[in-house]
Regions:
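Thiol/selenol-based redox catalytic cores and closely related redox-interacting motifs
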Residues: 36-115
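Short glycine-rich hinge loops at helix-strand junctions in the catalytic core
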Residues: 26
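Local sequence-structure signature of Cys/Sec-based thiol-disulfide redox active-site neighborhoods
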Residues: 1-21, 29-32
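Alpha-helix C-terminal capping segments
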Residues: 22, 115-116
Length: 116
């Protein structure tokens, strides 16, 4: 994986905006199509750690998989949440820009510029 990459969903307007901002800045990065490529558990844990967030904070609560898996339940462990994120990657908030030891959620998209 490149030193810098964007977790990207081309159907998401915020993700497309973040991609455009990074390209405009001539940032050297790779696009990671996280909905199409298999996420490895250790890799996802590393990204969550770089974000300085808990897995729960990174959940998209409006997704059907959130409701279907009762993720509102505060008794669900972080490990279980990570496993569900791997199984249902739409649960992961996006876009996420990772550069070296830093990562940031691109909400708003301009956030990605904070770590370039």
């Amino acid at each position: 994986m490149a030193k810098a990459f964007l977790f990207h969903n081309p159907r998401c307007s915020k993700s497309r905006q973040a991609l455009n901002l990074l390209e405009k800045e001539k940032e050297n990065f790779e696009v990671f199509m996280y909905l199409d490529e298999k996420l490895e558990k250790d890799f996802l844990k590393e990204i969550i750690q770089k974000l300085g967030m808990s897995p729960r904070e990174l959940l998209r609560t409006g997704e059907s998989a959130y409701k279907e898996n009762n993720l509102k339940d505060s008794n669900i462990s972080e490990e279980e949440i990570i496993n569900l994120m791997i199984e249902y990657p739409k649960l992961i908030e996006r876009p996420i820009y990772v550069k070296g030891s830093k990562a940031i959620v691109g909400r708003p998209p301009e956030n990605v510029l904070k770590i370039i």
